[in-house]
Amino acid sequence: MLISKRIVMSITNEQILDAVADMSVMQVVELIEAMEEKFGVTAAAAVVAGGAAAEAAEEQTEFDVILTAVGAQKVQVIKAVRGATGLGLKEAKAVVDSAPASVKEGVDKAEAEALKAQLEEVGASVEIK
């Protein structure tokens, strides 16, 4: 009576990759089909769900300068708002009186930082969004 023994060899990932690298394209396709059938899976490409996250990660290029509080030097803040925006006295006073209010919208970072520094210099509290 003959007893067959099954000898299991330890095959490394490196050896598997080398074997696949030596195959022709048709052999690789057949291997993939056999693996799909044996394991009940498909070799469809994974869908990357990072499109929205990538957009959010982009650096912001436009900023809004928000006057959050006027401080003690209201007249100086009005003058600074007028100078930065080109508004008339009445319009600039209305912006300052309605704090928190947007002083300038859609400006680049450098301009937003400069305006913030100018308004803070005269005692206003400013936020950049």
Swiss-Prot record:
Source organism of this protein record: Photobacterium profundum (strain SS9)
Record flagged with keyword Ribosomal protein: yes
Any one Gene Ontology molecular-function term assigned to this protein's record: structural constituent of ribosome
Keyword annotations: Ribonucleoprotein, Ribosomal protein
GO biological process, one term: translation
Subunit organization: Homodimer. Part of the ribosomal stalk of the 50S ribosomal subunit. Forms a multimeric L10(L12)X complex, where L10 forms an elongated spine to which 2 to 4 L12 dimers bind in a sequential fashion. Binds GTP-bound translation factors.
Name of the protein in question: Large ribosomal subunit protein bL12
A single cellular component GO annotation: cytosolic large ribosomal subunit
Family: Belongs to the bacterial ribosomal protein bL12 family.
